[in-house]
Amino acid sequence: MITITLPDSSTKTFDGPVTGEQIAKSISEGLWRECVAVEVDGAAMDLSEPIATDAAVRLITTRDPEGLHIMRHSAAHVMAEAVQRVFPDAELTIGPVVEDGFYYDIDMEPVSEEIFSRVEAEIKKIVSAKIPFVRKEVDKAEALDRYRDQPYKTEILNEIEDDTVSLYTNGDFTDLCRGPHVPHTGFVRAVKLTKISGAYWRGDQNREQLQRLYGTAFFSKKELDAYLTLIEEAKKRDHRKLGAELDLFSFHEEAAGMPFFHPNGMKLWNALLDYWRLEHRAAGYVEVKTPVMLDRALWEKSGHWENYRENMYVSVIDDNQYAIKPMNCPGGMLLYKEKRYSYRDLPLRVAEIGLVHRHELSGVLSGLFRVRAFHQDDAHIFMTPDQIEQEIFGVLKLVETIYSTFGLGFHLELSTRPAKSIGTDEQWVKATAGLRAALDAYGKGYAVNEGDGAFYGPKIDVHIKDALGRTWQCGTIQLDMSLPERFDLSYIDAGSEKQRPVMIHRVIYGSIERFLGILIEHFAGKFPLWLAPTQAVLLPLNDDMIPYAREVRQEFEQAGIRTEIDDRSESLNKKVRQAQIDKIPLIITLGGKEKEARTLSVRTLDGQVRHGVSHEAFFAVAKEHIAKRLQTPVVFA
């Protein structure tokens, strides 16, 4: 007899080995039809695999996130088979699931998106046939013989240490794969190829260049259509497109991956950092600045030279090797060591907007999202062990304050001790307990990623959600037990003994360049008044009004409102249209009537028009919006 325990703690008994499919059918036909795989004692398996011992079982359905992941894995196989039908000489490599879909790297002649319709036609045939995915475990030697003419698969096989490997076959197509897969190709109900790009085998630019075909898949056409609509909206909001249209930033081949910020971009940048500094001063942080280039010996001491050397830019000065910093932390350690600290001086909260450089392959550079030079809003908090909870809680509240100002929701994930780590059991228990206690006190809920912490300490990752519902990992609250040890940091406790401080390394914006890119897309370039590069534009009705417009601009600037004048010899309608294209929140018309009455005709970006607004009333509303950093539309009575 075999006893199967279900998630609700109920049990089912079977006379002998049983499959997930049989378990599902024993519960209901409807459940069986929606099952894609089964989780047995925490491990995902095919529905057709026998379960030979007592086990805790969870049926994975089309409603579960894991179900979608498994189906997309199967969709990658279906796409690969379809490609081989269209291009018989194409040689397959690997095809993993990624966020929002999957891809397959294929060795074939360069192709374009023109092939998508032909490949998708074959996909439809494969899906309609509802071909079963059949798993077969074979000796590694047999697999090597099977793939002897396929060097990519042979390379993968030679790296596998197990004596047996699994192959999956659906119809005439077989691929090396761990699985699991959906029962048959009919579960891949709605598929769309999305893009194609070049990729190096194993990410090594010295290896073969492949064609990477991306796709996505859903369990229903309705879900696919909703996703494609989202993608189209995302294209309209693409920060690279809006960055050019709004004259915010640019890139040049003379400095690949290093953005050039234009005057409009710098206004946005400064507004972002002015706000950051305001909140950090209020939260008790001091700001510092450390050098961009530091001696190799420092990077050896910090461990970066050993673990991060390939991503660092190095130079030789006076026969000494220096590295441009990829991270701000080591410089912060040197600053701490300059002074002698007592327990009464702690916690010490030190923040830095530091410029860092990291070498990224040219193929992965992507606008402001993936660059080689960027600024990071690092902070290091030095504290005693019993201050961990209160300091983590304080950072969480600061995170909430800052993200809510931009209308960004977020969720939290706690990552605990990995298999390889430094520090004692006692240190890890106390550190993790401090993070948990702070999260529990914060009270907003969190997920736990067991074993996913850094080797030097547990961490909290903060994932923000933008206006399109996309999530971005920006903030990190990392407890670091490595650097205080490496740099021999200390403080004097109440008993006049030296102690090692606990250190939190945290970022909120993360890469400021990347965060700006996220904000551009979040707001679709229509920034709230306080953040907009140009907050108001003055449109003189004729050349005679230009001197008056200059007077008004000076008045606006003195009131703290970033203002420009459009004095081109164009019609008012064209000027208004240009201001709308430039997404300027307040568009103000100045004519003889307005000059005589000392009033303003104000048009907002959302189409509201108000005539006869006094300067005093205008300033009262605009200054309140800016001071309070409101996201709501500006409304004039």
From Swiss-Prot:
Give the UniProt family note: Belongs to the class-II aminoacyl-tRNA synthetase family.
Q: What is its EC number?
A: 6.1.1.3
Q: What class of enzyme is it?
A: ligase
Which InterPro entries does the UniProt entry name for this protein? aa-tRNA-synt_IIb, aa-tRNA-synth_II, aa-tRNA-synth_II/BPL/LPL, Anticodon-bd, Anticodon-bd_dom_sf, Beta-grasp_dom_sf, TGS, TGS-like
Outline the extent of the TGS domain: 1-61
Q: Where in the cell is it found?
A: Cytoplasm
One record GO biological process: threonyl-tRNA aminoacylation
Carries keyword RNA-binding? Answer: yes
Q: What's the protein called, per UniProt?
A: Threonine--tRNA ligase
Free-text function comment from the UniProt entry: Catalyzes the attachment of threonine to tRNA(Thr) in a two-step reaction: L-threonine is first activated by ATP to form Thr-AMP and then transferred to the acceptor end of tRNA(Thr). Also edits incorrectly charged L-seryl-tRNA(Thr).
Q: Which domain of life is it from?
A: Bacteria
Q: Which UniProt keywords apply?
A: Aminoacyl-tRNA synthetase, ATP-binding, Cytoplasm, Ligase, Metal-binding, Nucleotide-binding, Protein biosynthesis, RNA-binding, tRNA-binding, Zinc
The cofactors named for this UniProt entry are: Zn(2+)
Give the record's subunit note. Answer: Homodimer.
Cofactor note, please? Answer: Binds 1 zinc ion per subunit.
State any GO CC term.
cytoplasm
Chemical reaction(s) catalysed:
tRNA(Thr) + L-threonine + ATP = L-threonyl-tRNA(Thr) + AMP + diphosphate + H(+)
Give residues annotated as binding Zn(2+): 329, 380, 505
> Which organism does this record belong to?
Desulfosudis oleivorans (strain DSM 6200 / JCM 39069 / Hxd3) (Desulfococcus oleovorans)
Q: Name one GO molecular function term.
A: tRNA binding
Family annotation (SMART domains):
tRNA_SAD
The record's HAMAP family line, in alphabetical order, gives: Thr_tRNA_synth (MF_00184)
Q: Where is this region: Catalytic?
A: 238-528
Q: Which CDD domains match?
A: TGS_ThrRS (cd01667), ThrRS_anticodon (cd00860), ThrRS_core (cd00771)
